[in-house]
Amino acid sequence: MARQRRIKLERSAYYHIISRVANKAFLLEGSEIKNTIVRMLYRAADFSGIHVVSYVVMDNHFHLCIEVPDKKDIPKEEVIRRIGILYGDEKKDQVIRHLERLEEAGSFLEANLKIDRYRSRMGDLSEFMKTFKQRLTQWFNMNHHHEGTLWDGRFKSLLLENGPAVKAVVGYIHMNPVRAKIVEKAEDYPWSTAGAAVQSDKEASKGLSLDVADKRWLTRERKLIQGGIMGSQAFVEELSIHFKDNFHGVHVSPRPVRLGGSNLYMTHGQRSA
């Protein structure tokens, strides 16, 4: 059976992402691993041009709320800067020297193609997650005597309308450690935007104003981990028609849901999204 195509907009959009460790194993325990995940998350996001609105890293899974910006042409100098962020200065210098040799030899087309291969990985949800998870898997396997895949299949994604839907998801993400009874308050958990913002993390604090983390999120919402589209009725209706092939051509009627005090609408979930 062919896997379902992922719902992705070609314009600026917000997404709720969840990815689990294979076999639900608790392989992400410990501060060293979680700190590394957060560092790699922001490096992959910078490389991809993605804005991390919120995150939480648990022992066997993580949640993200991200904004993928409009597609735009990225200058060569910016591509090279991002290569250094993701791969380090040594790799960046290698790329610069290689480009200089190609250009000195008059191979401008080959030099442009090399930059384009990196550029094509930027500004895209799937490429961002591929970069992030592959880099993390390589690091984990090398440092923790692990072999094979680290993750349980594809990540799940929920397309969000900016506004109440994003705010609700941010609140849900921040309250994960509270629901798991690890901490009493969301801001007491270090490996989330809520906790990092309290520790004066400027990147994390950008998403904190959206936080609605309170007792409304003390119950687990399965609907948020099944994928699809969430927002106002008009938003969900419009996009469910646009992405009708993702629903096997069947008309999908948005169903009302109440999340974090907000009245929203959702499509039916896509388990393999």
Pin down the residues of each PLM region.
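Short Pro-Cys-Gly-centered "Cys-loop" motif that presents a nucleophilic cysteine in a tight turn
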Residues: 1-59, 67-273
